[in-house]
Amino acid sequence: MISSILLIFGIGIGYKLFYLQFVEGEKYRKIAEDKTLKSFTVNSVRGNIFSEDGSLLATSTTKYDIYFDSKTVSKNTFDSEIKNLSISLSNHLDREEKFWYDYIIDARENGNRFLPIAKNISQDLVQKLKTFPILRYGSIRGGLIIERKIKRDYPLGKIAERTIGYERIDEKGNYRGVGLEHAFGPYLRGKNGQMIKRKISNGQWKVLENNVNKEPIDGLDVRTTLNTSMQDIVHDYLLEQTQKYEADHSTAVLMEVETGKIRAISNFGRTDDGKYYEKLNYSIGEATEPGSTFKLMTMIAALEDQVIDTLQMIDTENGELDFYGFKVRDSRKGGYGKINAMDIFRLSSNTGMVKIITDAYEGKSEKFVNRLYNMGVNNPIDLGIKGEPNPKIPHPSENDWNGLSLPWMSYGYGILLTPLQILSFYNGCLLYTSDAADEGLGVDLGGRRII
């Protein structure tokens, strides 16, 4: 009777073992694996940003943290090499040989699988550590655990801070940023890798060496047209003048006329406590009324339409004109009398410029505005840097067009342009922009690919 019961009991246990191993085994193995194995993202090294003279504007510095898994090392290896490992560590890191010996022995006795050895060390030192006793056997046999950290550094500090910009990832995984960092983000980012880690004691994770791990692909380098020496001069002088006149904000752009390349951009905005820093890139992102700087566009439009020639005489009307009760005045009291169109532009006469346009385009304002459109004044530069607003050039077909629109436009009011849009036009619409897709890739002095 007892033997029958034991037999039935044994059969039941055997069936249960068979069922767990072959029927539900895969499920439980998967549960165990999910708890002990995990995929981690290995960040790629972001590409550098260089000035045209080869100076670093933005770079990623890589630092390493080193840990030791004391349990994974065999007894023979540990006992025979622990003393020499302590000597090597004392020669290259702080602390004496005795400290390292006692520190590692204690970790071994307590089964510590994630013992801190060094933090924020360079790659050169990591390579040396890989040659040390015990550690030379790697992660599986030598207990060596290496964790890489990447930090973005800006060698110029606050200079051109907004132009160089930044890029971050939001909680939804979208890239957000400003300046060159964001404009060239797709090239600078590279491609992240993947690393499988096994969970060990104390909630720590250790790299599992297998074929699933993928090394990250580092980002490309970008060479800009900025010149660090010129940038430094523009930065200092603009800050000095901004502080002198207690301006709310300011911007300065230095362009190489022959090529259209931007050699320096500097911006300052005032904080509530009266200090200045690069709050925004006003040269790209802020559109304002250009005032007298628009007179070049006005004069070109009139010359292109052949409604004026440079020697035609214009009466500046004692420096004052009236439009529906609103006055247009010259900066010189009494005006400039009768002068030719060339001198109107040279002397920047408001009344003279307004008379040229209102006399020539009376009843046909659309012709003047269409000429401006034909010249591309209403088109953005589209540098690829986010934040550039579209120019605002009113058109007679729009509802807000009125009797003041034409005279006010002629000397730069009632319209909106950014400083860089104005500068581009003044340089014959020649503005150098980099298109990585068209220019292809080159090689810099360090051997890394650049845009």
What are these regions (language model features)?
Residues 30-41, 235-243:
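Short, basic/aromatic recognition patches
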Residues 56-58, 64, 200-211, 250-291, ...:
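Beta-lactam-recognizing serine transpeptidase/beta-lactamase-like catalytic domain environment
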